[in-house]
A protein has these predicted regions:
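N-terminal Rossmann-like dinucleotide-binding module
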Residues: 1-48
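A short helix->loop->beta-strand "cap" motif at the edges of active sites that frequently abuts
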Residues: 49-52, 95-101, 124-126
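Short internal beta-strands
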Residues: 30-36, 52-57, 106
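ADP-ribose/adenylate-binding Rossmann-like module
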Residues: 81, 96-112
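Rossmann-like NAD(P)H-binding beta-loop-alpha module
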Residues: 91-94, 114-168
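Beta-loop-alpha module in the N-terminal Rossmann-like domain of NAD(P)-dependent dehydrogenases
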Residues: 61-94
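General beta-strand structural signal in soluble alpha/beta enzymes
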Residues: 7, 55, 76-80, 103-105, ...
Length: 168
């Protein structure tokens, strides 16, 4: 049986690359989401024959996507967007899916979700797959939190790409 794959953030740089890769390997995608680039989302749904696609900036579509998460068992979910807004989707997903793979390329989600996210993933017998070395490092930090004074996280892309550099 083919795995059901869901991509949150298919219109971003990583999402575009993942869809192209899957297409080249004849891997079917079960569902995709986008936020701002609705034209690309529509193009992707047609080009890759993806019937389940959701424009998350549209309140009606957002509601439908949440229902979609509740009603469908997903084998692999990719969080390729940025920001912590996808925590709500992760929570819905985790309430309805077991033994799935959760691939995260979204460090804001890991930081904002913290132990709560990681513990819920473990409790629901899902498996987290950090997709970047930063995320892997964050997930495997075992220092006692009370000994931490500061944490520096570099911002090389995503929402920080066009921000002015700050001197500290």
């Amino acid at each position: 049986m083919k795995p059901k794959i869901l991509v949150i953030g298919s219109t971003g740089k990583l999402g575009v690359k993942l869809l192209n890769f899957c297409y080249s390997k004849k891997i079917n995608i079960f569902g995709i989401t986008g936020f701002k680039n609705n034209i690309l989302l529509n193009t992707q749904s047609k080009k890759y024959n993806i019937k389940n696609f959701f424009k998350l900036n549209d309140p009606t579509q957002n509601k439908k996507f949440k229902l979609f998460l509740k009603k469908n068992l997903i084998d692999i979910i990719y969080f390729l967007d940025y920001g912590y807004n996808s925590l709500i989707y992760a929570d819905i997903f985790l309430n309805h899916n077991r033994n799935s793979q959760i691939a995260i390329a979204n460090k804001e989600m890991i930081i904002a979700g913290g132990d709560t996210l990681v513990n819920k993933i473990e409790l629901t017998k899902n498996k987290i797959i950090p997709l970047d070395s930063e995320h892997f490092s964050l997930m495997n930090t075992v220092l006692p939190i009370e000994n931490l004074n500061k944490v520096y996280i570099t911002a090389s892309g995503g929402p920080f790409y066009f921000k002015k550099k700050c001197k500290s």
